[in-house]
Swiss-Prot record:
GO terms for molecular function: alanine-tRNA ligase activity; aminoacyl-tRNA deacylase activity; ATP binding; tRNA binding; zinc ion binding. Pfam families: DHHA1 (PF02272), tRNA-synt_2c (PF01411), tRNA_SAD (PF07973). It comes from Anaeromyxobacter dehalogenans (strain 2CP-C). Disulfide bonds: none annotated. This is Alanine--tRNA ligase. It comes from the Bacteria.
Amino acid sequence: MKTPTAAEIRELFQRYFEEHGHRRVASSSLVPQNDPTLLFTNAGMVQFKDVFTGRERRDYSRATTAQKCVRAGGKHNDLENVGFTARHHTFFEMMGNFSFGDYFKADAIAWAWELVTSPAWLGIAKDRLAATVFAGEGTLPWDEEAFELWKAQGVPVERIHKLGAKDNFWAMGDTGPCGPCSELHYFQGNDVPCAEEQAGRKCQGVACDCDRWLEIWNLVFMQFERGQDGGLTPLPKPSIDTGAGLERLAAVAQGKRSNYDTDLFRSIIHAVEGLSDKRYDAASDDGVSMRVIADHARATTFLVGDGVLPSNEGRGYVLRRIMRRAIRHGKRLGLERPFLAAVCGAVIDEMGAAYPETRENRAFIEKVAQQEEESFRRTLDKGLAILEGEMRKLVPDATHDGKPATPAPDRARPIIDGKVAFQLYDTFGFPLDLTRVIAAERGFDVDEQGFDRHMAEQRARSEWKGSGEQGVDDLHKQIAGELGEVKFLGYELPAARAQVKAILANGARVARAGKGDKVEIVTDATPFYGESGGQVGDVGHITGAGLEIRVDDAQRPVPGLVTHVGEVLRGEVAVGDAVELSVDDRRRDLVRANHSATHLLQLALREVLGEHVKQAGSVVAPDYLRFDFSHFQPVTEEELAAVERRVNELVRENAETETAVLKLEEARHAGAMMIFGEKYGDVVRVVRIGPSKELCGGTHVRRSGDIAFFKIGSEESIASGVRRLVAYTGARAVEVQQREAEELRRAAALLKAGALEVSQKIEQTQRRVKDLERALEEARSKAAAAQSGDLAALAKDVGGAKVLAARVEGDGKALRELADKLRDRLGKGVVALGAEQDGKAILLVAVTRDLTARLKAGDLVKEAAKLVGGSGGGKPDMAQAGGSDPAGLEKALEKVAELAARALA
């Protein structure tokens, strides 16, 4: 049988289950939707979580996927092991088949066995396979059914192993669906090292942590519901959730002991070889670094492709840790120039056919990688210098590279101060684990509790409130599961009749509500648009017999559910009532115009700035629109003008807005724009306005001319590689334009110029200011030269050198210039100058270079600064300090003279 490629295995797996009645479902984003409990998608079942719990309904009961997954950060974290083992990854693909109350154990086991062993499919040798089943634990019964089913497939009894709940019982949480699981393991051979045997104990076989028996597929049988009391109730419709890692299956099918030796990684590692001019040797330190880079480039490519950007919090921080770990391993390979973008390119070459979105976003992914690496490299050497300086303080006999001499066996490892580790994180972007690894390599530990304390203090100072990822109300999920999707009528109607299906008040479901109650009303249908996709929710009224509810907002807390948030102004509302729902159509018109303008804006930005521009967030409100987009430098005034001009051209074309409901793949092939990391269903709505074509569920104008006028208000950076633009439409845009014109008229009047001459007049004024500054500088320099001659005469001879301490007039710059001139005049000596400016003390100390081995300016100024209530530092030959108490200047200067005299005597 021909050895299959990983791409063939991925296709073969999904095709097998398609032939057995499963719907092939595309991988969801690595950023989980509506699941704040997860940092990243880490299993195939994540996108089906609400389907398994009954809170979401789909038009199929069997599914198969190849799901993008990341395990790095949080509970599921493989980061530290990556590169050092044959099978750990931050990014991996989890293939799976799922049954939502359809088939159960018999089919799941039979299909798994056939797919793995049949020569028509994977053709893996049966005599190298073993199965595990749940052995039972406490009140949980053993899974005799699974045991008999494996036996019926021909698996010998001695190769069906019973394991406890730790290995073979799965639960979604403390409560909810759970059940036994069953694993398929592949025997790699007794020559695979086992730590148990090396310690003189027996290898535990399938239960051992060694790689002799490699788990390749896990079948979860969801057959119980665990209640609050811990009791188990059989589910009326048991379900199946399975997961088979593509990387492991590829290694087994290709006869490789390491995932990194498969074709999934071969081309990526080959790219690293080419960049480093080194050959891959799996057993060497360089081999570890190449594996780290290959794995982390995959994670970087797919995380950035799903809209995650490097930052100092949340998901962005995990990505930054991954990227910077890869960059550091690149430096260990001798890669002194940025390389990560090129390796990400190799990942896209390898995986772009399976994940076309990586090809579409290639330029953006590579740019983010390049920018992050350049940023980190700028600070890496500075941070390492600080870390090595700290190591030398702790171990004075350290070598030149900061590596301490071998400590005595009973000597405790020296500890890097948590404050230093935090400074490296806060100032130089060193993730804590990077500091930990560098320290460990050189025989040091890190005070992680101290680091955490400083981190907590910083968050308190900046009133840090967390990532904002708050839990989704279980009541909303419960209602959505009971009622199904609320029908949206707002594309055609501003008002409609509907029936009240649920009422929430004070965080609880109630049967009725009366005047003054703050409520959330759920109806079976609604013309109200629930906030989503950046578009704010509608406002309006709900009325009925003697009833009036003011709707202040419409929300979409979970997919398919719209809640009307407001206050009962009159009468009473009860579940089952027939009501009239009316949207504030005038406000909706303003929102429509801003939403359609947002689509045209994205098109114009891509035309003017380039295809790398992607939406990174938006707000569509009645009075403005805000658009966040990927771009790596400030947008110039000329570019902004071109964007604004292009949008207004499209407005004047008065193109009709067209909508179509298409299958996701049809929309993709039609060239519709999609949003980074957005979760789309199998069927999507495409909105076309002239040349603009986007996937969108929002409300829009009938023709582009209804926007009337478009005006950009501001543009700024909000994160690395992300810009924010605020704009206006219609009457609000005219108002902004008029306000700007009025400001221009005022500026012209102040400058005594015409409106079209303002910039010219400002340039003239700037040139005049520069000329005056230059003249002032020359006068100051002459004054300093004259003053230096007078002051030099006051210097005292100490041990063959001159010491001068004097109070003068001037700012910090003037003191530096004067100190330079005095130092030159003295030839060999120490200069200390002090001045008062704006009620503060300024101190400056300069030491001639031939004396810096005996005394340092930084040490002198630190001591003196204490006497003026301040602090300072600098280089050995010049240092500066500031303080809040200028009354102490005389004593501070005397202190410098005293310390200098003592050192020189």
